A protein has these predicted regions:
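ALDH superfamily catalytic-core signature
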Residues: 5, 11, 17-166, 186
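Short active-site oxyanion
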Residues: 9-12, 179
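Short acidic/histidine- and often glycine-rich active-site loop of Leloir-type glycosyltransferases
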Residues: 71, 170-173
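Short, cationic motifs built from Arg/Lys/His that form the positively charged side of catalytic pockets
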Residues: 77, 177-180
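A local structural motif
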Residues: 110, 175-178
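C-terminal lobe/hinge of AMP-binding adenylation domains
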Residues: 165, 172-175
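Low-complexity basic/metal-binding stretches
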Residues: 171-172, 179-186
Length: 187
């Protein structure tokens, strides 16, 4: 609230839920601020065949699977050119599998638990829904067990391929790969 109303703040940028975004937008705008609110947004990335594929994959994995995989500025949706999709996907899987999943208090942990048992079940349900709708599950994070935290709320990196428009994995904030043959086909 302080930022939304403070006279020295000239603009606000927000990514997150619609209900919070509407509050931020209306409050900040009422105080004369410029507002950018991406509500229920899903960030997209394009990967072309001339990209530095391995370096791009590592950057995307670092972005996407930090903060227990709940980072609003991640790239959970990738449109990957068919000519490089298999190679790129192999790098994504390599780096996702290498993430250290563990207790949030361990400095070596790269992917901690989700917030609750209910949230874990919700994520597992989203993954199952993607499989039911026909997206190809390349890396399944549903059955992660962390030694010493067997009852923890851990979900590992999950990657879908062949996600199509209209699938839940493509429309909601779930990480998926959508292949295409040319830059104009998917843009």
């Amino acid at each position: 609230e302080l930022l939304l109303k403070h006279p020295d703040i000239r603009g606000i940028s927000y990514v997150g839920s619609t209900s919070v975004g509407l509050h931020i937008y209306s409050t900040a705008a009422a105080h004369g601020k410029r507002v950018q609110a991406l509500c229920e947004a899903k960030n997209h990335g394009l990967v072309l065949r001339d990209a530095a594929l391995e370096r791009s994959a590592l950057g995307i994995i670092n972005s996407t699977f930090g903060c227990a995989g709940m980072r609003c500025m991640a790239l959970p949706a990738l449109c990957v050119e068919e000519a490089c999709a298999d190679e790129f996907l192999s790098y994504l899987v390599k780096y996702a599998k290498a993430r250290k999943i563990g207790c949030a208090y361990d400095p070596a942990t790269e992917l901690g638990p989700v917030v609750s048992a209910e949230h874990k079940q919700s994520v597992i349900n989203w993954i199952s829904k993607g499989v039911e709708e026909g997206a190809k599950l390349i890396l399944d994070g549903r059955n992660v067990v962390v030694p010493g935290f067997e009852n923890g709320h851990f979900v590992g990196p999950t990657i879908f391929d062949h996600v199509k428009p209209g699938m839940t994995t493509g429309d909601c904030e779930i990480f998926g790969i959508q292949r295409w043959r040319s830059p104009t086909e998917n843009i």
